[in-house]
Swiss-Prot record:
Stretch list, region Microtubule-binding region: 1-92
Biased composition (Basic and acidic residues): 99-111
Signal peptide residue numbers: none
Biological processes annotated in GO: attachment of spindle microtubules to kinetochore; cell division; microtubule bundle formation; microtubule polymerization; mitotic sister chromatid segregation; mitotic spindle assembly; mitotic spindle assembly checkpoint signaling; protein stabilization
Protein's job: Kinetochore- and microtubule-binding protein that plays a key role in spindle assembly. ZNF207/BuGZ is mainly composed of disordered low-complexity regions and undergoes phase transition or coacervation to form temperature-dependent liquid droplets. Coacervation promotes microtubule bundling and concentrates tubulin, promoting microtubule polymerization and assembly of spindle and spindle matrix by concentrating its building blocks. Also acts as a regulator of mitotic chromosome alignment by mediating the stability and kinetochore loading of BUB3.
Localization annotation: Nucleus; Chromosome, Centromere, Kinetochore; Cytoplasm, Cytoskeleton, Spindle
Keywords: Cell cycle, Cell division, Centromere, Chromosome, Chromosome partition, Cytoplasm, Cytoskeleton, DNA-binding, Kinetochore, Metal-binding, Microtubule, Mitosis, Nucleus, Repeat, Zinc, Zinc-finger
Domain notes: The GLEBS region mediates interaction with BUB3.
Organism, scientific name: Homo sapiens (Human)
Name of protein: BUB3-interacting and GLEBS motif-containing protein ZNF207
UniProt-annotated stretches for the region GLEBS: 359-391
Gene: ZNF207
Biased composition (Pro residues): 142-157, 447-467
Comp. bias intervals (Low complexity): 267-276, 310-362, 433-446
Upper lineage: Eukaryota, Metazoa, Chordata, Craniata, Vertebrata
Length: 478
């Protein structure tokens, strides 16, 4: 085999030492940069061709190739692409390229070695921190278990020594509470054995469970329980000891139905008069209840807003939580009661005021905001029924119930004509007449007035007549 042919050089321009990927591109470059007439901008193929063109066409002589590096401006050299380049220049070019390649290889090797070194160093460093991390990880666990003994018994022994040398069980209970970790440490203190548990409870309970201990006022019980069993019992006793817990629901009905149900019953059971229960229910914080019982005295103070328990006087009517229902212009229509002062600020004649048997409160239904029951009373269904009783107060159902003279105990039979409109007011009157019996019926109406109202209205007055409206109302309503 013959000797290997010399490696072909990458296309490059002899005039400007510029490299190109393809010889065609090189030719285009030469024609545009080096062989272009500066007068007519005609692109020629070689240097001599450019000189001849300028001489013949423009009568000018060109001594050098334009845009060429110094020393390579010879216009007589006929170079076309890679052809025509002097051999010595070609050799020099090869030598330069070889040097460049060698240098690049060396750099690559150095870079590779550097990368390997970096990798090794990184690996070593990564391995080093890993062992360190576990150690650090172990340390925090030790401290954590020490602070909160609960997380793990195994952690306690290591953690306890730093906290306080001494009997592990006893000391851990004390430190958590003492350092001022009541929120987090309380349970842990509770977990501690009875011996340590008792001391921590006394200092710790105030921050952790202040209300239970003072309100029940039974610190000895908590101590005894703590002694009897681990501190775990201590925490439960506090919540259980909170006797007032049941009271809040009674005094503050958060929900209309439940609140009304609970408050009236409890109030009735208590020595407080039915009026108080009415006031409690009336203050149920919801429009449906508030509208009917806007101007009721509120000694119980079921409202979240401050209620003057004893002075339930003229100030009470404006107090109803919902202004829309309490739009009252003090009218002289005061119920016949010694407590006339309270209902003194009753709503205008428009709003129907239903006087209850309790004679301590006045139920008010403003005309502007018609409750669901009132609307239902105005429906044609009930208007049909009205003729039977002999009275057709359909036009003013709200007033009808008021005139309905609920005060007469049963009152319902007397107001047979009024009965249809009564549903809305009957509910409220019902509270006073039969607190236990009517409350359940009345409560649902607030939450779901339509279904409960008809049965309720019909039930008390006359079973036959009352039963029909419920069916009709339910069918029409739903």
């Amino acid at each position: 085999m013959g000797r290997k042919k010399k490696k072909q050089l990458k296309p490059w321009c002899w005039y400007c030492n510029r490299d190109f990927d393809d010889e065609k591109i090189l030719i285009q470059h030469q024609k545009a940069k080096h062989f272009k007439c500066h007068i007519c901008h005609k692109k020629l193929y070689t240097g001599p061709g450019l000189a001849i063109h300028c001489m013949q066409v423009h009568k000018e002589t060109i001594d050098a190739v334009p845009n060429a590096i110094p020393g390579r401006t010879d216009i007589e050299l006929e170079i076309y692409g890679m052809e025509g380049i002097p051999e010595k220049d070609m050799d020099e070019r090869r030598r330069l390229l070889e040097q460049k390649t060698q240098e690049s290889q060396k750099k690559k090797q150095q870079d590779d070695s550097d990368e390997y070194d970096d990798d090794d160093s990184a690996a070593s460093t990564s391995f080093q921190p890993q062992p360190v991390q576990p150690q650090q990880g172990y340390i925090p666990p030790m401290a954590q278990p020490g602070l909160p003994p609960v997380p793990g018994a195994p952690g306690m022994p290591p953690g306890i020594p730093p906290l306080m040398p001494g009997v592990p069980p006893l000391m851990p209970g004390m430190p958590p509470v003492m350092p001022g970790m009541p929120p987090g440490m309380m349970p842990m203190g509770g977990m501690m054995p009875p011996g340590p548990g008792i001391p921590p409870l006394m200092p710790g309970m105030p921050p952790g469970m202040p209300p239970p201990v003072p309100r029940p006022g039974i610190p000895p019980m908590t101590q005894a329980q703590a002694v009897s069993a681990p501190g775990i019992l201590n925490r439960p006793p506090a919540p259980t000891a909170t006797v007032p817990a049941p009271q809040p629901p009674v005094t503050k009905p958060l929900f209309p139905s439940a609140g009304q149900m609970g408050t009236p019953v409890t109030s009735s059971s208590t020595a407080s008069s039915n009026s108080e229960s009415l006031s409690a229910s009336s203050k149920a914080l919801f429009p449906s209840t508030a509208q009917a019982q806007a101007a009721v005295q509120g000694p119980v103070g079921t409202d979240f807003k401050p209620l003057n328990s004893t002075p339930a006087t003229t100030t009470e009517p404006p107090k109803p939580t919902f202004p829309a229902y309490t739009q009252s212009t003090a009218s002289t229509t005061s119920t016949t009661n010694s407590t006339a002062a309270k209902p003194a600020a009753s709503i205008t004649s428009k709003p129907a005021t239903l006087t209850t048997t309790s004679a301590t409160s006045k139920l008010i239904h403003p005309d502007e905001d018609i409750s669901l029951e009132e609307r239902r009373a105005q429906l044609p269904k009930y208007q049909r029924n009205l003729p039977r009783p002999g009275q057709a107060p359909i036009g003013n159902p709200p007033v009808g119930p008021i005139g309905g003279m609920m005060p007469p105990q049963p009152g319902i039979p007397q107001q047979q004509g009024m009965r249809p409109p009564m549903p809305p007011h009957g509910q409220y009157g019902g509270h006073h007449q039969g607190m236990p019996g009517y409350l359940p019926g009345a409560m649902p109406p607030y939450g779901q007035g339509p279904p409960m109202v008809p049965p309720y209205q019909g039930g008390p007055p006359r079973p036959p007549m009352g039963m029909r409206p419920p069916v009709m109302s339910q069918g029409g309503r739903y």
